[in-house]
Design a protein with these regions (language model features):
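Alpha-helical interface subdomain recognition
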Residues: 1-40, 49, 63-68, 75, ...
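A short, Trp-centered hydrophobic/proline-enriched beta-strand micro-motif
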Residues: 78-87
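Short Gly/Pro-enriched turn/cap motifs at secondary-structure boundaries
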Residues: 91-94, 119-122, 136-138, 164-171
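Flexible, small-/acidic-enriched active-site or ligand-binding loops
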Residues: 98, 152-183
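A structural signal for short hydrophobic beta-strand segments in well-ordered beta-sheet cores
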Residues: 101-104
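A short core secondary-structure module
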Residues: 110, 114-158
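A short, charged helix-loop
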Residues: 173-200
Length: 343
């Protein structure tokens, strides 16, 4: 469960030891998340762990002041606090910086925050939220700033947990922000730095958010092979039929491709390269691989693959979310095309 992930050091993998973390590299954390995905059958939990590590905590590690880090990182690492990352709004999704949430500067240097954030992982249960809002309405990306917002402040309302197709164990919902008064120290970086902060974090998140799913794909492949070897039809294990064997071979191909694209992104990050291309490709390949392989696993399992009491059906539902979160696959193909000079 969540607390077990904290107790075993997973949540603090990249956090400095002075805050209770393990001080490991992003590449090492990728391997940790992949192993977690292989060993844990709760894909919602593994996604939630990766989400907090690669968003809220990463913002604190890279952009937080010493005071901000000391206030929040120990609790996030030991599991006593939960962090969320609130960029999306009802009318602001792929067009990320078309925000209606505003943060008006007060005479004392603080800010008054108003707006509605939608579809937020951990939104209904978070203790701390990284909120993006416009401090210069009409200035687009250049007017966006980022804030650390404790959810126990007056005016912060956490919405109900929303039902969704997959990853149902991850709380997901909205945040209402009504005249929330923030002290000056809530600002992350400088005013107007929100777009650069978001772009830096989202490239890392896209690169590695599928690490648990790559581990889950390995588990899925192993289970499908075992089923195909033991399930007999026509006097033979179904693994001996070419149609079944080819589906399993394709699952292996996709798993290796997804893993290699994630590792390639990790190498790019370690070198200090710009991540946008590697991140986009890693997410596209891993997402498509997860969906296609889940469909193949469902077909090989026959009726079992269509029933909710078996893991196969849940894996397919869970995989579908990847088409949307951390940047839709279609939009990321536009990003790749633009970087190639054809979009």
């Amino acid at each position: 469960d969540w607390q077990a992930c904290a107790d075993h050091g997973v949540l603090g993998s990249m956090v400095a030891g002075e805050f209770g973390g393990r001080d490991r590299s992003l590449a090492s954390t990728l391997l940790t998340l992949e192993g977690l995905g292989h060993g844990c059958t709760d894909n919602g939990l593994t996604f939630a762990v990766a989400s907090q590590i690669l968003s809220t905590q990463l913002v604190l590690e890279r952009f937080g002041t010493d005071a901000q880090q000391r206030r929040w990182l120990p609790g996030l690492v030991d599991g006593s606090l939960i962090g969320a990352f609130a960029m999306t709004e009802l009318e602001s999704g792929s067009d990320a910086f078309s925000l209606t949430a505003t943060a008006e500067e007060r005479p004392d240097g603080g800010y008054r925050l108003n707006g509605h954030k939608a579809y937020i992982t951990f939104g209904p249960v978070c203790d701390l939220c990284v909120v993006f809002a416009s401090t210069r309405p009409g200035a687009g990306a250049w007017g966006v700033s980022a804030f650390f917002v404790p959810t126990d402040l007056p005016g912060v309302h956490r919405g109900d947990v929303r039902s969704k197709m997959g990853m149902r164990t991850t709380p997901f919902g909205d945040l209402e922000l009504a005249d929330v008064d923030l002290p000056p120290e809530s600002l992350i970086g400088r005013p107007g730095a929100g777009a650069s902060i978001f772009s830096s974090i989202i490239d890392v998140e896209r690169s590695f958010i599928f690490a648990p799913q790559v581990g889950a794909m390995q588990r899925q492949l192993e289970a499908t092979i075992e089923f195909a070897r033991t399930r007999e039809q026509g006097g033979h294990p179904i693994a001996r039929y070419q149609a079944v064997a080819h589906r399993i071979a394709a699952m292996k191909e996709r798993h290796e491709a997804a893993r290699l694209f994630l590792y390639r992104a990790a190498l790019a990050e370690a070198r200090g390269d710009r991540l946008t291309m590697a991140a986009s490709l890693a997410k596209i390949v891993a997402c498509d691989a997860g969906i296609a392989s889940s469909m193949d696993a469902a077909v090989v399992n026959g009726a079992r693959g269509y029933l909710p009491e078996f893991e196969v059906e849940r894996q397919l539902r869970d995989a579908m979310g990847g088409l949307v979160y951390s940047g839709s696959t279609d939009v990321l193909r536009n990003v790749v095309a633009r970087l190639l000079g054809v979009g």
